Amino acid sequence: MRKLRNTLAAISILFLASCGGNKDYYMFTSFHEPANEGLRYLYSEDGMHWDSVPGVWLKPELGQHQLMRDPSMVRTPDGTYHLVWTTSWKGDLGFGYAYSKDLIHWSEQQMIPVMANEPTTVNVWAPEIFYDDEAEQFMVVWASCVPGRFEKGIEEEKNNHRLYYITTKDFKTISETKLLYDPGFSSIDATIIKRAKNDYVMVLKDNTRPERNLKVAFADSLTGPYSPASQPFTESFVEGLSLIHI
């Protein structure tokens, strides 16, 4: 959630969408700093060469700062697009949610108060949405800092993040918030993909100094337990990852 170096770093999830005619395109969601303008799209025919779709497609209305950072989207089997995003740097106890049938016209925006039972929570950062095709429900994972909750590392208490999650079928009734992953260090920007049945991969950012790099963990179940985090597979100062299973 530090200032992003480039547009690609702002990606929260890569998804495949049909963009008219009979041709399929890769698309991803993005945003521009200072993140108060709203949702943007980029598209590609091959997943390697990208161009922007002009315009802002959803202006943020929620939260203390009314931001749209880290937009993450998934398409369900019925063709509906479901979007979640970060609404504020600090102070909000939830993330934003909206849905659309065509990526143009969006539902009313809702705040999903996932940390309402933890009033000392500093933030709710980078929610990532995953559709569980086996359970036919959504899972959203995000990073929050609850001061004093975990052993203090080299980061200050208000920057000591861990990864949490909820599940829901409709974003009207949500599960109890649970801890997804404690790797023993401050971590953010987790994204999960399913490689096969009982085979899940989670990539996350080690948000401690001087690391600030990406690591990977594995699990037999979507909700874990996940393996210890790997050694970094990127240079330092990398975040905002995107994954797609090809």
Residue ranges and their predicted role:
Residues 18-245:
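Carbohydrate-active catalytic/glycan-binding domains of CAZyme proteins
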